[in-house]
């Protein structure tokens, strides 16, 4: 029986969710791919007209439903090299930790009982992003309390310390550190969502001199390991527009982009929902990313 894990391996997606963005980040210029050892220059031109190129990817090292990778730096560098060769210029660490598992030795989180990581993945990702001229976005910490309580305000306190220590120890030292990713996934009427995203987004910008701060979109109803649409989570286009207009109104001054997940709706509804997403993003001066991560 083929599992989602097998599928990811066979398609060489490296366990990452793909972010499609027309102008995600220009970067400092195209790298000379002929300089990559053992890597042929690839033609990344789209085979279909008027399509968006895949220019960014999540680094989903600490995940909810996928076992953690056990790669070392050799394997990760090969991954970065291949990603850069096909035109990906932006990598987003989807979260810096989940519950007790963390990607870097955070003094604050270790003091709260988190496990000491065997390797400083954050430092490694930033070094590789520097080497391959890629932009890196840091995903905030997920304590798991939101998933337990439905109240996103729980995530503010730990991230106050995480944001400060990450900027001091990593962000201010690596040229590839391009911004922050608010990793919380929300659905409509999520308790504390607007205040939490605004508080975390503002702190990210304040400490880093205004670096970009994108955030994730709605929790998806089509799960990555299945094909069933959760009918209880269904929402109309009009309702979607009203809810996200309220959210964007409350966060647009500190959040630069929103990456809507594509798995909440059926295929024949994509155009209508995507049109609303783009209209709202334009209204509030935000970027609208397409987070095609469901593999459904």
Language-model features: locations:
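N-terminal export signals
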Residues: 6-29
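Short non-domain terminal segments
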Residues: 5, 12, 31-34, 56, ...
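C-terminal segment of N-terminal export signals and the immediately downstream linker at the start
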Residues: 1, 23-49
């Amino acid at each position: 029986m083929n599992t989602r894990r097998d599928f990811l391996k066979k398609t060489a997606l490296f366990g990452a969710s793909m972010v499609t963005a027309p102008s995600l980040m220009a970067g400092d210029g195209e790298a000379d791919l002929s300089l990559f050892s053992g890597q042929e220059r690839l033609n990344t031109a789209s085979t279909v007209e008027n399509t968006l190129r895949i220019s960014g990817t999540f680094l989903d090292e600490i995940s909810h439903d996928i076992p953690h990778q056990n790669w070392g730096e050799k394997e990760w560098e090969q991954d970065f090299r291949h990603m850069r060769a096909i035109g990906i210029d932006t990598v987003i660490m989807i979260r810096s930790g989940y519950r007790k598992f963390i990607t870097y030795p955070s003094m604050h989180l270790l003091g709260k009982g988190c496990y000491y990581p065997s390797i400083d993945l954050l430092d490694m990702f930033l070094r590789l992003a520097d080497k391959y001229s890629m932009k890196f976005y840091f995903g905030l910490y997920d304590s798991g309390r939101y998933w337990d309580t439905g109240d996103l305000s729980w995530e503010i306190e730990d991230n106050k310390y995480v944001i400060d220590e990450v900027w001091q120890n990593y962000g201010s030292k690596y040229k590839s550190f391009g911004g922050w990713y608010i990793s919380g996934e929300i659905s409509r009427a999520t308790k504390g969502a607007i205040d939490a995203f605004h508080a975390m987004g503002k702190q990210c910008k304040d400490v880093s001199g205004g670096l970009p701060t994108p955030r994730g979109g709605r929790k998806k109803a089509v799960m990555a390991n299945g094909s069933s649409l959760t009918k209880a989570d269904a929402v109309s286009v009009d309702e979607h527009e009203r809810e996200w207009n309220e959210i964007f109104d409350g966060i647009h001054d500190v959040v630069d982009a929103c990456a809507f997940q594509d798995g909440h709706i059926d295929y024949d509804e994509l155009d209508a929902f995507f049109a609303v997403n783009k209209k709202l993003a334009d209204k509030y001066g935000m970027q609208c990313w397409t987070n095609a991560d469901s593999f459904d």
